[in-house]
């Protein structure tokens, strides 16, 4: 004998009464219930109505499992008649524990969404015995495909970067993100990374929120920088990510290393050259990251190539400037001093970086204002790459936006 009161407690739904329980097979229970709530709201005029007009057609709703059983709640919604509207419209009662036209209770939908975090439609489909289309329908109902600006109070710092939707293709999308109330949020997935597309997105941000933006973090792509400048103007600092900058000046050292290693292969004995094994990895590390063996190999390389030593030391010096707790003005002076050292060295491996440095002087030195990086954007890029691999190369931007939101914010939303 099933105790209806205990079963009602397990269901976790109030204002209902269990009429009967049917065990259809060893895996499925159907619980027939009725609402104890009275009244509804007219779908015509929106006013409260209490004139009972019978019951609507029976509906089945998938609910949370109990003791390993699939659970379906079976209910005939009460209907009420409006005495005000012409034609005396009738309306079905809407209860707060399920959404009209959904085949699941709200609790079950949220359970499905939690299962989908860091997972795939296919895996959840197998686990819950649901079709992937049914799961995607829940996703579409609960997660928007664009950011909802209404609850957002401020943006402060915006990050923007790009990612290829298809491996090996130049099918790039721009990713715009921000920390909102301590949570990393994607606020835009743009079909193009052009200046016009990014500018249009920035202009789509409500004026009240555009006024709260203090900094835009980006790589050195001209389209992103130009779009941010055209919309936000001089009031907002455009900050070139220090790690993109570091990649450029470190590339200069690496290019020099390749040339010097080719020269050393010709000039050194095989034994002496082999003693420089793994030098290509070692030169890419900072001194404090090296092991004792790696330091010996690096010093050996420096003995054979003073030019690499000089370039390596200049690279380390610029990194030290970035790491130092200095103001923007101090940072500018230190970098100008570094540029003079490069000029005095007569090294040419930094020429490309120096050209970029002169072209984007303000954006690069804006890092020292608040020591901001777009590292959170790079982390988000890696997250999206994982989602794409896990979801078998998802290319639909709307679905990608939903999946990124779910993985980043799903636990807080559906806890």
What do these predicted ranges mean?
Residues 38-40, 79:
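Residues immediately within or flanking Cys/His clusters that coordinate Zn2+
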Residues 272-346:
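Helix-loop elements that line ligand-binding/catalytic pockets
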Residues 1-38:
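N-terminal alpha-helical interaction blocks
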Residues 46, 55, 60-169, 211, ...:
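Short, positively charged, Gly/Tyr-enriched micro-motifs
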Residues 136-217, 222-230, 234:
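RNase H-like nuclease fold core
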Residues 31, 42, 82, 124, ...:
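Short, conserved catalytic/metal-binding motifs centered on acidic residues
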Residues 339-415:
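Basic, amphipathic alpha-helical segments enriched in Lys/Arg and hydrophobic/aromatic residues
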Residues 219-222, 229-270, 378:
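Conserved beta-strand -> loop -> alpha-helix junction used to position metal-binding or nucleic-acid-contacting
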